[in-house]
Amino acid sequence: MSSANQSIPVLVAGAMGRMGSEVVKAINSSKDFQLVGAIDNQKDKEGQDIGSLLGLGELDVFLSSDFEGSLCAASQNVPKDGSNNGAVLVDFTHPKFAYKHTRTSIAYGVHPVIGTTGITADQLDDLSKFADKASLGSAIIPNFSVGMVLLQQAAAAAARFYEFAELTEMHHNKKADAPSGTCIKTAELIEEQRSNFNRSFVEEEESIKGSRGGSRASGLRLHSVRLPGLVAHQQVMFGSNGETYELSHNTIDRSAYMPGVLLVIKKIRSFNKLVYGLEKIL
């Protein structure tokens, strides 16, 4: 069988989490992929079959808390001929681990696909240089939803015509970072079309600090909501004399992200650099 027809070896970090468990299920349901590792810090479940833990039946893949050891094992799938057809890491862990996990994965020659948000602009620049040096396809994807990519493109197009805009993102109350990486990415795309927003006509005074949200250097304001019952929601509102223009996207189930996740896993091995954003893969 040619390497092009072989299943892609994948390990999942955060395999017991809300997103990670969905990825494990999606990987298991497709013949295009082979689950070779499951990583999570739940010590009480370490060594147990991830399939049994997630109700999938035994998969002969056992949960480990050893991130680097799992990468080392997966790196055995790295081809010796220099081609970028090795294993892929899908990471949905915690913002404080995102940078380290990405860099370590690249160092082991395992293609990182990072859905964990919280990577700073400086860290992104460093990781981009590191991936370039390694000539290893790597991906940092703030949001895997095709619908969100379409919203971002529409928002960027609208920014050419509106000088006033504010963004609101809403997530479940177990999300650690605010604003979300998706919201920041949307703001960045909008700012590529216009550098200054929301010039003030009055001297604003907040009676409760933070009432007006966080303001970026461009003047764009970002607002975050955290409540149980939410999954992921974003609204971009533009305003002008006599009208508002609103764009919104709502994720009601995490299965909506899986087509994007699987697409990136399939395509990232054909890259030799770091890509940021799903729109660079589509």
Swiss-Prot record:
InterPro entries associated with the record: DapB_C, DapB_N, DapB_N_CS, DHDPR_bac, NAD(P)-bd_dom_sf
EC code(s) of this entry: 1.17.1.8
Keyword rRNA-binding: no
Gene3D superfamilies membership: Dihydrodipicolinate Reductase, domain 2, NAD(P)-binding Rossmann-like Domain
Catalytic activity: (S)-2,3,4,5-tetrahydrodipicolinate + NAD(+) + H2O = (2S,4S)-4-hydroxy-2,3,4,5-tetrahydrodipicolinate + NADH + H(+); (S)-2,3,4,5-tetrahydrodipicolinate + NADP(+) + H2O = (2S,4S)-4-hydroxy-2,3,4,5-tetrahydrodipicolinate + NADPH + H(+)
Residues annotated to bind (S)-2,3,4,5-tetrahydrodipicolinate: H172, G181, T182
PROSITE patterns recorded: DAPB
Record key words, sorted: Amino-acid biosynthesis, Cytoplasm, Diaminopimelate biosynthesis, Lysine biosynthesis, NAD, NADP, Oxidoreductase
Binding positions for NAD(+) per the UniProt entry: G14, A15, M16, G17, R18, M19, G115, T116, T117
The UniProt record lists the keyword Cytoplasm: yes
Pathway per the UniProt entry: Amino-acid biosynthesis; L-lysine biosynthesis via DAP pathway; (S)-tetrahydrodipicolinate from L-aspartate: step 4/4
Family that this chain belongs to: Belongs to the DapB family.
PANTHER family for this protein: 4-HYDROXY-TETRAHYDRODIPICOLINATE REDUCTASE 1, CHLOROPLASTIC-RELATED (PTHR20836:SF0), DIHYDRODIPICOLINATE REDUCTASE (PTHR20836)
Classification via NCBIfam families: dapB (TIGR00036)
Protein name: 4-hydroxy-tetrahydrodipicolinate reductase
Organism: Prochlorococcus marinus (strain NATL2A)
